[in-house]
Amino acid sequence: MSNNNDKQYTTQELNAMSNEDLARLGTELDDVTIAYRKERFPIANDPAEKRAARAVTFWLVLGIIGGLGFLATYIFWPWEYKAHGDEGLLAYTLYTPMLGITSGLCILSLGFAVVLYVKKFIPEEIAVQRRHDGPSEEVDRRTIVALLNDSWQTSTLGRRKLIMGLAGGGAVLAGLTIIAPMGGMIKNPWNPKEGPMDVQGDGTLWTSGWTLVENDVKVYLGRDTAAIAESHTDATGEHWSTTGVSRLVRMRPEDLAAASMETVFPLPAEMVNDGAEYDPAKDVYEHQMHSVHGPRNAVMLIRLRTADAEKVIEREGQESFHYGDYYAYSKICTHIGCPTSLYEAQTNRILCPCHQSQFDALHYGKPVFGPAARALPQLPITVDEEGYLIAAGNFIEPLGPAFWERKS
């Protein structure tokens, strides 16, 4: 506030002033000059004012509808995964778009209402203030309160109860649209799910489908053929099966060319349905799809050129994790969990397209660029007696981005 006015006002003098006088005094003390001020609707009961109020009300009501729609979608809409051909696939597909549409409608409508109210009801005003320094005095504190009261009165919000109520309700709902998604985090990541370990792990951050190796389960590196299943019904109920080839098939080393990469998923021996063991009636499609959709299951199988493989720097304690020129790294970026789905064969770098982290495949998946701070976990692999690539063990560190309980 300004210290240019030498007059010291007593409490009695300040109490004797009206709110308008205090507001005017506040502008003078603050070296503010109101160069221009015009009321939007100087005539009482102006039809244009009523139209403007209805327009603001419309956007506020629309914002409330959007907020309620978001909460209803988030709480009641069927969000569980549905595979191709499942009943309810359309509703599942629309879940995320509905969240975006309703939350966007809520926030944008409230924004439109605020902008419209300012343009239609707040008086046009041009004020000029000279810059000055100095601590605030008692008179300044009193006058700023008066200025705020004056702003409240001139905004006419005090007599527009409907707009105030709608704005308050809309603001609360807009806040809920931001807070409600955090409900998805209200889950203890260390509580195992009911039932035994399966192809998606036990539900904790420590496990994946590859953890089955620790339970003496033979786990193959399964290539995704992207085969689409068809529904058929028999005496035991509805089943899904592919024709000619299953969704996941085992891989041999010769199936991958040098300087190339393949995304593989855990394929337990009991789910194998290819080669000499192929049985068109074997019902494994849904189980294999659970493996494909496992949040920590995706692994990049990389076959290096022989010349490049000779340059590899092994991580201490993981010297035997590879099989010849074949290296298997987790496909989950250690930054925030995006899929590191790009592989540059010429530079042997693994790229995450989300935030441009880069990992050196010749240096145990060490990050060399971008925000990722930890190397990609490496899966130990080998071949079995039939020549198929299998997991020789489980990952020795948690997969994906960091979390509080990690020590590194």
Curated annotation (Swiss-Prot):
Which cysteine pairs are covalently linked by disulfides here?
338-354
Mutant lacking the gene: phenotype? Cells lacking qcrCAB show strongly impaired growth in glucose minimal medium, which indicates that the bc1-aa3 pathway is the main route of respiration under these conditions.
Which positions in this protein are listed as binding [2Fe-2S] cluster?
A: 333, 335, 352, 355
Does the keyword Electron transport feature in the UniProt annotation?
Answer: yes
Xref: CDD domains: Rieske (cd03467)
Q: Please name the GO terms that the record assigns under molecular function.
A: 2 iron, 2 sulfur cluster binding; metal ion binding; monooxygenase activity; oxidoreductase activity, acting on paired donors, with incorporation or reduction of molecular oxygen
Keywords on record: 2Fe-2S, Cell membrane, Disulfide bond, Electron transport, Iron, Iron-sulfur, Membrane, Metal-binding, Oxidoreductase, Respiratory chain, Transmembrane, Transmembrane helix, Transport
Q: Does the keyword Cell cycle apply?
A: no
Question: What's one GO-annotated cellular component?
Answer: plasma membrane
**Cofactor names:** [2Fe-2S] cluster
Q: Which domain of life is it from?
A: Bacteria
Q: What are the TM regions of this chain, as residue ranges? A: 56-76, 98-118, 162-182
The Rieske domain is annotated at 293-390
Cofactor annotation comment: Binds 1 [2Fe-2S] cluster per subunit.
The record's subcellular location field reads:
Cell membrane
* Primary location group: membrane
Q: Name one Pfam family in it.
A: QcrA_N
Q: How does it sit in the membrane?
A: Multi-pass membrane protein
PANTHER family from the UniProt entry: CYTOCHROME B-C1 COMPLEX SUBUNIT RIESKE, MITOCHONDRIAL
Q: How does it assemble?
A: The cytochrome bc1 complex is composed of a cytochrome b (QcrB), the Rieske iron-sulfur protein (QcrA) and a diheme cytochrome c (QcrC) subunit. The bc1 complex forms a supercomplex with cytochrome c oxidase (cytochrome aa3).
The UniProt family comment states: Belongs to the Rieske iron-sulfur protein family.
Q: What does this protein do?
A: Iron-sulfur subunit of the cytochrome bc1 complex, an essential component of the respiratory electron transport chain required for ATP synthesis. The bc1 complex catalyzes the oxidation of menaquinol and the reduction of cytochrome c in the respiratory chain. The bc1 complex operates through a Q-cycle mechanism that couples electron transfer to generation of the proton gradient that drives ATP synthesis.
Write down what this protein is called. Answer: Cytochrome bc1 complex Rieske iron-sulfur subunit
